[in-house]
Amino acid sequence: MIWRLALSESALCAALCLALTRVIMDLSLPEWVADWAREAPKLVAPAPGPISKQIIDKDRKYVSHAYDRLFQFTMKKSSGASIMDADGNVYLDFSAGISVLNAGWSNPKVVEAIKEQAELLVHSLANDAYFDKEADFAELLAKISPGQALGSTFFGNSGAEGVEAAVKLSRYYTKKGEHIVFMGSYHGRVGNALAMASRVKYKYGHGPFPPGIFFAPYPYCLRCWFKQEYPSCNMLCVDYLEKGILEFGGPSNDVASVIVEPLQGEGGYIPPPKEFMPRMRKMCDERGMLLVADEVQCGLGRTGEVWECNSTGTIPDILIAGKALGGGIPLGAIVAKHSVMDVWRPGSHSSTFGGNGISMAAGLAHVREILEQKLPERSRVLGAHALKRLQELKDKYDIIGDARGKGLMIGVEIVKSKKTMEPLYVPQMQGIAWRKGLMMITAGMFGNVFRIAPPLIISLEQIDKGIDIFEESTKEMQALLK
């Protein structure tokens, strides 16, 4: 009885907090969002419709089949948190283009910045000359870096390029050649980044891979590698890294860097315990290794912080950014301490399109919009509401094994039953939700985690609408398993 009373008081408190927040913070859609996008989801024809099908047929003939193509429709236009296909169907997007459009699809500030820059200078030749927006953007990134301690930026074209740059820089700085990464990690699909991926799906048929990369267990507490429970485990996974892998497991004294996602993305949207990142910092300091934070997916407001490192006060030596950095235009970067970045001499690293005119204009406008519209704070509020609702669904449905996350970076883990916690591969359930008008993408080492990662400008009403559809899809999927 006392437990039920406490639960009801907690629910009442959460409701009152949300009501108060709605008075202080406008949780409706921005005014610029198109009228058609406000109606999402709105399905007018079975997908793929005739126009989409024509384009899909041509695509299958001429475009590489390497892409997953999860959704069988052709995108036509977008606005806010909605996408319209070529046949007029409007979908509610819970993916933000894989955490790219944090300030919303077709944000007018970004669109206008692209148009203005295209009329002035498309390609900035940043490798051989100077460009004002590149300097402006680097200055902004220095000012918003963790602890304002990372003062120098190198721009590339993607998060994966950022990883490659971080690997090169850490080796150049330390004069060492090995790296520690984590089980469940994802850092890209080229070169060293691919070697650091932990899913066979991405690596199959592409070896051999560069040597000197060692995998440590990430604190995936739901499926602890050591069958322990947090916090009584005392972070055994970190002890294993320090005392097992580093001292006895293989690496010599030649480890240049520890490359880690402060909140693991592709591995299943896994927030580690709060002491994990500070322990990584301490370990790196004691052993002369650089700490590299891969914030490609979790950065720029996604978790309720500008950078997820900020949540634990951890200052990395190098931070990798991408995805949302460009506002929809290809862009990646490493932001590093001057003491680290400044060891590179002219010509040590380069990129033909790094610092490109269009990407600098778009990225600068997008990051400014994230900051000016206080989207990290908005993500924190909407994410708390979404996570509360999803955890209630977890208590209600046997196939929801976990709901976890920070801000609007939430993972919902689907299982065959809570009794066994055996992962349930979810493309079928993903299709059920899509046919109801909700776009979600998946993650997880077992392909059983839904990412709840909409644009941060999404409204409270749309969050609830999407979760309602998710519940309907869960109910249907659970019935199919009986």
What residue spans do the PLM features occupy?
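Low-complexity intrinsically disordered segments
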Residues: 18-22
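Conserved N-terminal phosphate-binding loop of PLP-dependent enzymes in the Aspartate aminotransferase
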Residues: 26-482
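Serine residues within intrinsically disordered or low-complexity segments
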Residues: 8-10
